[in-house]
Amino acid sequence: MPMSDYLDAGNEELLKDFFSEAEQQVEQLESNILVIEQDPTNRDAVDEIFRAAHTLKGGAATVEMHELSGFTHAVEDLLDGIRSEKVTVDGAVVDLLLTSLDVIKAMLESRAGGGPYAEDVSDLVARLRSYLPASGTVPGAARGLSVSSPNAAEAAKGTAVGEDGTEAPQVGRVPPLSLLSEYDRLELREIVPPEHSVYALTVRFDESNLMNTVGGIQVFTALKSCASVLKTVPDFDALYQDMFHEYVVYFVSTVQDSVCVSQVASIPDVTLSVSVAEVALADLCTPLSEHGELGVCADAGTGGVSEGSGAAVRSGGERVPNSLPKQVAGCAVPSAKDSSKATSSGYGSGSVLRVDAKRIDYLLNLVSETVIIKASLNQSALEFGEVYTLFQNANGAYKERLRKFFDRVPAYLEKVKNGQDADAVRKGMIAEAVGVFDIFSSFENGLKQSVTKFRSSAQNLGRISGELQEGVMKIRMVPISQIFSRYPRVVRDLSRDLRKEVRLVIEGEETELDKSVVEDLLDPIMHCVRNSLDHGIEAPEVRARSGKPAQGTLLLRASNEGNMIVIEVADDGRGIDVEAVKTKAVERGVLHPGKNLTEVEAFQLIFAPGFSTSRSVSNVSGRGVGLDVVKTHIERLNGTVSVFSEVQKGTRFVIKLPLTLAIIQGLLIRVGQEVYSIPIASVIESHRIKSEEINRIDNYEVFNVRNEVISLLRLDRLFGISCDDEVTGQYHYVVIVGAAEKKVGLMVDALIGEEDVVIKPLRDQFTSSPGIAGASILGDGSVSLIIDVGQLLELGLKREILARERREATVW
């Protein structure tokens, strides 16, 4: 069943918004639960947890995910007990909260997949309830708002005289805020815009009305036209049930006055009376006594019903209109800094990208500048048209004057022949010829002015387009905290399973990179983290014998280096034994026994498929199927992964990636008549060599660079391109490219230059082209294929392996 079946088609956007926001709330819950595990007295973290659960519960009710809303009620009860210090936070409570969070994730993923969550959670709900005090509690499934005192329900039944002489709740005598918990009051204060006033409307309904069970919904719908309904008592779920409620209290925020609000809420034959009390925002942060005084009453008049727009639930089942101002609609997010944190998950809307409004404003400003440049270029086009007309006129006059000049040449010659002074005749001819060329003077001046203005406009256009490109790319940039925030839970659970003590340190989580890159980094980093926990960091007793602290340290760090992002996963564990790696490589046939490797080269062997030095296989790792996946993933992103280690000091994985995959800087090269692009990030250096500098080893071409032998690949042969041997026979251009410690020289016909390259994916029959990563359209309209350096390096490595096997076969 598609998600749209749960709501009408008009609320499809509401579902998308809910899933996007649910990601943030789940991340908030998980991160802060781990915080209170370390520091149970952290009140800010407790409040954040309660706030996130409260918001998630309300959002679930909005999109009719009742199983999620009901279960989150139970979780919220336990959180309320923690917040009120009735429940002590210990390991068991944290485990229960994390287990409940896993169920919430499963519910979200199930709904995103098209169906409700079918598993029975009654046992888990019972465990949640078991921590609550036996008396004075209100079951979460039966309430939408926390009640501050046992008399709160009765408090709503104060009396006032309505228009028909009946008695209605008198909010002046019974404060509306006494119906709310301290948290509910704080939440009201947080979500109300400063320009809005808050009112508590107590509405009494006519039981004699044939449709009395929907009276609460009718008033809610009417209020949407002039106010934002923040909370209701009873909660919104209860209003939807087939049950008559004599009194309902609506907490609303609006820019309208109390008279207008009360008139809208008064519906003939539905309501008997409406009382309105204004709620001061300052009082929302003031703890109330059991019968504290608050509010000024205004008797309600009667008024017509105004139809409103659709509504969304804010929290606790209370709905908020879809047409709310942005500052209200966005208030469900706990804080501005949290709104930028999103985690990748199966239920999240991967296409949703939250962008800082300042970045949008910056782009709009640039767009306005492009309008100015457009007008300037249009003016230049008109001026060039005028200059062209001037040129045509001057050209016509020039031809006519030149014809007349040549017609007069015989006359000048006749004068010399008749004995006139030759110098005088020559001066006359020169004077007439100069007059002919002076015709172009005005054209030349006009052309210079037009070219100068056009050049200035072109420079401004280049500047603005560059800034626009940078600004648009920044829109896609998201903080890496979106994935870093996933690992505290992973480290906690794995370290407990492995019975190790591990402290996770995260640095540089504000570092930004392209969203598409972030989504593809989760698994590679996860493999590195699991490898460090399982193979790197030792058990506490082993660390103690080595003189290390019992608690190991795992570091996650992100930083920028130019146009690259560097991600490090480091531990202070046992490190990698180089000799053990070499021995294992020889056993697996990956390495020849007589081959001498540097430490760096030996460390790269651990990325070979199926390679593992572990003597046992665990649930975490040891099968050798992890690090080769890391390497494959990272190289697919045009990045590199390296490992550095020292025995008994630790291991460090270093991942380097371009900030974005959409636009790269490329080195344009020519092979035959074809132009290719090589990512600048992969280019080490370039050379121009003579044919005699090329040597052969086992029928493979190599050349020497500072006493280092570099393998050569002729791109013309690799891609099947015919070249003119007469042109390429004497000198060759070689571009040395590399990743990690691997290098190869690409032999090309010419180096064209550097250029920003927009990557377009290849489709259909071109997707399997070896050595090609994509394509780009150049400034002249031609297509340039982008070289996949990683695949070319693999090709070079395979050639070396084949050559080594041939040598070994010859020896044997």
Swiss-Prot record:
Write down the SUPFAM superfamilies for this protein, in alphabetical order: ATPase domain of HSP90 chaperone/DNA topoisomerase II/histidine kinase, CheW-like, CheY-binding domain of CheA, Histidine-containing phosphotransfer domain, HPT domain
Subcellular location per the Swiss-Prot or TrEMBL entry = Cytoplasm
Residue numbers bearing the Phosphohistidine modification = H54
Record EC number: 2.7.13.3
Kindly report the protein's main subcellular placement as a broad class: cytoplasm
A Pfam family the protein falls into: H-kinase_dim
Q: Which residues form the HPt domain?
A: 1-111
A Gene Ontology biological process annotation?
A: chemotaxis
**CheW-like domain ranges (all copies):** 663-798
Report the GO terms under cellular component.
cytoplasm
Q: A single GO molecular function, which one?
A: phosphorelay sensor kinase activity
What does the UniProt keyword field contain? ATP-binding, Chemotaxis, Cytoplasm, Kinase, Nucleotide-binding, Phosphoprotein, Transferase, Two-component regulatory system
Concerning Gene3D superfamilies, the annotation shows: Histidine kinase CheA-like, homodimeric domain (1.10.287.560), Histidine kinase CheA-like, P2 response regulator-binding domain (3.30.70.1110), Histidine kinase-like ATPase, C-terminal domain (3.30.565.10), HPT domain (1.20.120.160), SH3 Domains (2.30.30.40)
Task: Give the enzyme's main class according to its UniProt record, as a single word.
Answer: transferase
Q: What does this protein do?
A: Involved in the transmission of sensory signals from the chemoreceptors to the flagellar motors. CheA is autophosphorylated; it can transfer its phosphate group to either CheB or CheY.
For this protein, the record's PANTHER family field holds: CHEMOTAXIS PROTEIN CHEA (PTHR43395:SF10), SENSOR HISTIDINE KINASE CHEA (PTHR43395)
- This chain's protein is named Chemotaxis protein CheA
**To which species is this protein native?**
Treponema pallidum (strain Nichols)
